Amino acid sequence: MRKGDYMVISEQIRMLCAKLNISKAELARRLGQSPQNLNAKLKRESFTIEELKKIADVTGVEFKHRFAFASGEEI
């Protein structure tokens, strides 16, 4: 799902799971939460920056958050 020209975080998390060949249930287990809780967060798009950092940590990737202009400039 896309909103405007950006990908919503839930889609990024689903793509991350697919690329790592892990289920959302496995991600939830690694995060120490129930699959139902993770699915609810994905549905609501309700992740804190700290939760996103933890997702990155438990999956071995780097989380980068920044503002990006249409020109490609990021801050």
Which residues fall in each region the model found?
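DNA-binding alpha-helical recognition surfaces that contact promoter or target DNA
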Residues: 15, 29, 40
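Short C-terminal boundary/hinge segments that cap the last helix of small helical domains
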Residues: 60-75
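A short, Lys/Arg-rich alpha-helix, primarily the initiator
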Residues: 1-26
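Alpha-helical residues within the helix-turn-helix
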Residues: 18, 29, 57
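Short, basic-rich loop-to-helix N-cap that marks the start of a DNA-contacting helix
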Residues: 44-57
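Recognition helix of helix-turn-helix/homeodomain-like DNA-binding domains
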Residues: 32-47
